[in-house]
């Protein structure tokens, strides 16, 4: 701080000649552009939340579907803001545009790590009946994502077990059947009844193909999203 204050007025004057001042036209225009961009971003998120709220109260599915489509058209195709990408992804999932949602999710994952989102990519691929090898690779990538997460969590933390479960489950879904025993080990590890029941239900969801299919059936999907 003292070094900054010690700069001479001459030095500051030279600096001002080579850079825009805070009240220069360029600075003002850039500030206004940023404010307008922020306002637009907030408008997209606000409208999405409003549609969801009304969908949960009085709005019918058809009206919500049309509003989602109209909102999607408002979002620029080259939008790169993380929060807007997340909102766009949610809209696409609601509309059943899973191929487009998959592409947007890849953009999100390039900006931020999320094991859950990575896992959903595999669900999308399964719903779209993509090549089994592509799905296997997706689950292995998910397992690696959970492994990275595990290494950042203290072992005593409750979410450590959830992340470990995610890693084992992804490996099992990738075809590594030896991880079935590791999943059972996590169930046996827990002696709190509520925790044990939660993991037992998750175990059933993985092992029971009907439970997995029921989950897939609940996801809307259309190959025509124009």
Say what each PLM segment does.
Residues 35-38, 70-81, 107-112, 144-158:
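Flexible helix-coil transition and linker loops at the boundaries of alpha-helical arrays
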């Amino acid at each position: 701080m003292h070094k900054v204050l010690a700069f001479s007025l001459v030095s500051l004057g030279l600096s001002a000649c080579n850079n825009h001042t805070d009240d220069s036209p360029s600075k003002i225009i850039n500030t206004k552009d940023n404010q307008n961009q922020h306002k637009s971003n907030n408008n997209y998120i606000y409208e999405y939340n409003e549609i969801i709220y009304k969908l949960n109260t009085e709005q019918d599915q058809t009206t919500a579907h049309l509003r989602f489509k109209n909102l999607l058209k408002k979002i620029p195709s080259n939008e790169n803001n993380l929060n807007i990408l997340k909102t766009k992804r949610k809209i696409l999932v609601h509309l059943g545009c899973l191929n487009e949602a998959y592409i947007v999710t890849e953009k999100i994952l390039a900006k931020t790590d999320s094991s859950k989102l990575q896992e959903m990519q595999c669900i999308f691929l399964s719903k779209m009946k993509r090549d089994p090898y592509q799905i296997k690779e997706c689950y292995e990538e998910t397992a690696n994502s959970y492994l990275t997460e595990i290494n950042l969590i203290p072992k005593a933390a409750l979410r450590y077990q959830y992340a470990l479960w995610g890693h084992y489950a992804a490996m099992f879904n990738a075809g590594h059947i030896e991880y079935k025993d590791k999943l059972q080990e996590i169930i046996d590890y827990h002696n709190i009844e509520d925790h044990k029941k939660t993991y037992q239900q998750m175990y059933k969801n993985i092992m029971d193909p009907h439970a997995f299919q029921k989950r897939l059936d609940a996801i809307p999907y259309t190959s025509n999203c124009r």
